[in-house]
Curated annotation (Swiss-Prot):
GO terms for molecular function: RNA binding. This is Ribosomal RNA-processing protein 7 homolog A. InterPro entries: Nucleotide-bd_a/b_plait_sf (IPR012677), RBD_domain_sf (IPR035979), RRM_Rrp7 (IPR040447), RRP7 (IPR040446), RRP7_C (IPR024326), Rrp7A_RRM (IPR034890). It is found in: Nucleus, Nucleolus; Cell projection, Cilium; Cytoplasm, Cytoskeleton, Microtubule organizing center, Centrosome. It comes from Homo sapiens. GO terms for cellular component: cell junction; centrosome; cilium; CURI complex; cytoplasm; nucleolus; nucleoplasm; small-subunit processome. It is linked to Microcephaly 28, primary, autosomal recessive: A form of microcephaly, a disease defined as a head circumference more than 3 standard deviations below the age, sex and ethnically matched mean. Brain weight is markedly reduced and the cerebral cortex is disproportionately small. MCPH28 is an autosomal recessive form characterized by reduced head size (down to -8 SD) and variably impaired intellectual development apparent from early childhood. Part of the small subunit (SSU) processome, composed of more than 70 proteins and the RNA chaperone small nucleolar RNA (snoRNA) U3. Interacts with NOL6; required for NOL6 localization to nucleolus. Its main location: nucleus. It comes from the Eukaryota. Gene3D superfamilies: 3.30.70.330, 6.10.250.1770. One of its GO terms (biological process) is cilium disassembly. The keyword Phosphoprotein applies.
Length: 280
């Protein structure tokens, strides 16, 4: 019985790869030196009928169990044999179909996930997804022509990439602020158009507007407000300190008057005893 099981395993090693229901398994290795294989679980990305999706239907491959050393460039290269890859995006967890997709910033983004991830691979043609589902391995992530950095070399590269280019950073910030200002202007224009106009039920929305315009929430305005609050707080603390000092000085003055009064009393008693006291 044991010999029969060994014979079946030796004859059919790849066809018995356990994988989640509906997924195909693709074995990969970090390099040629690695003996054990790691498995990527892939399926065609799809959503329910009538639900909007961020990714194009029939051209997107959803990948599970992506190891940390497998980058977007590595996945694009590994799957390029199946067809032209349009884009690859790694994420911590799968996207909700209903959630709107926000453009990712090149500089202002959270730290990379230190663990296994999921990936969305978009091919230019649907045939790329079909070829990826039938792909056999093992595929090599790091090769001589396309080495993947690891260890201290990866740390050095990550540190160098963490220092942003000032000009590129300025361009991205300016672009974001222009889009934000345009959005605020559109919202204000829409609110102004709807002001005083009754809705379907006859209600009129009343918006309170101050006589003075609100300060723009810029960094300079925020710094001025903070400086004004600091001066007000320090002035209040200074006034409290002077009042406390005034009470202290008044108490010391009264103590000195009492001391001088006692000294004058003793001197008068001494002069009376010596019969030299002449008050006039």
């Amino acid at each position: 019985m044991v010999a029969r099981r060994r014979k079946c395993a030796a004859r059919d090693p790849e066809d018995r790869i356990p994988s989640p229901l509906g997924y195909a398994a693709i074995p990969i290795k970090f390099s040629e030196k690695q003996q054990a294989s790691h498995y990527l679980y892939v399926r065609a990305h799809g959503v329910r009928q009538g639900t909007k999706s961020t990714w194009p239907q029939k051209r997107t491959l959803f990948v599970l169990n992506v190891p940390p050393y497998c980058t977007e460039e590595s996945l694009s290269r590994l799957l390029s044999t199946c067809g032209l890859v349009q884009s690859v995006e790694l994420q911590e967890k799968p996207d909700l179909a209903e959630s709107p997709k926000e453009s990712r910033s090149k500089f202002f983004h959270p730290k990379p996930v230190p663990g296994f991830q999921v990936a969305y691979v978009v091919f230019q043609k649907p045939s790329g997804v079909s070829a990826a589902l039938a792909l056999k391995g093992p595929l090599l992530v790091s090769t001589e022509s396309h080495p993947v950095k690891s260890g201290i070399h990866k740390w050095i590269s990550d540190y160098a990439d963490s220092v942003p280019d000032p000009e590129a950073l300025r361009v991205e910030v300016d672009t974001f602020m222009e889009a934000y200002d345009q959005k605020i202007a559109e919202e204000e224009a829409k609110a102004k158009e709807e002001e005083g106009v009754p809705d379907e039920e006859g209600w009129v929305k009343v918006t309170r507007r101050g006589r003075r315009p609100v300060l723009p929430r810029t960094e300079a305005a925020s710094l001025r407000v903070l400086e004004r609050e600091r001066r007000k707080r320090s002035r209040k603390e200074l006034l409290n300190f002077y009042a406390w000092q005034h009470r202290e000085s008044k108490m010391e003055h009264l103590a000195q008057l009492r001391k001088k009064f006692e000294e004058d009393k003793q001197r008068i008693e001494l002069l009376r005893a010596q019969r030299k006291f002449r008050p006039y």
